[in-house]
Amino acid sequence: MGRPRAKFNARTMRKWIAEGRGQGHGQDYLSWLKVQNVPSQGYVHRIMGWKTKRRHEFMSNNEAGYFHLLEWSPFVTDVREQFPLLPLDETIAIAKDHGIKHPTDPRTRYPIVMTTDFLVDVQRNGSTVQYARTVKPAKDLCSERVLEKFEIERRYWVRRGVDWAVVSDCDLPVELIKNIQWVHQYRDVDGKLSIGSTDVEKAERIMAELIRQGVPPAKSASTCDDRLGLAPGTGLALVRHFLATRRWSVDMSKLINPQKPIALSA
């Protein structure tokens, strides 16, 4: 949960609710906090979502990494980041009932609307199940104040029957995330590559054959570009596209180095 950069008060809250923040689903969802609203250490991310077709905003590398894992999961159908715990009166009451100081803006002393980093819709056995997840560095998990705020958040979601948990950087598979990040923007190549469907199929055959012979993806891609007269970089973009769409299958838990051979599954 981030603290707003600008002063937060009742007027700010009413304005943001009127703007539709924290409301909607999929492409129509607006996050409660935007990167310009929260003090940054330079690690903000804006990422176009595969599933939602909208731009997501994240306040840290860990949040962005966790988002890429959600993107890769075939069971996740919607991701709502910086989801507000409204109504504000409810978190205030939870805090009071359990002797916890509710977060406030130190400049206005007005209670801050708390947020959960991710509210995730997952398909399970034909129905949609929601999970609430908060991302936090492991080094911060020993802070008594952090744990107090977690308790408010946890109890908010318990009331709604939603599974809530904390995800730390220790829970994030680094190599898998790096691989997803490498292919992510190439899932949809329409408008990015000047190549027809026939040449895409030819390129796939050429590169798959070379890669299965042990030729690294980068070399296979440049060879393909030369053979088909494609613009430099087209072949490697297609390699990333085939992986992003799962048209090609590899062990994504092992870091992909395009300069080294990879094993394509049959």
Predicted regions and their residues:
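Electrostatic, structured charged patches in enzyme active sites and in nucleic-acid/phosphate-binding
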Residues: 1-266
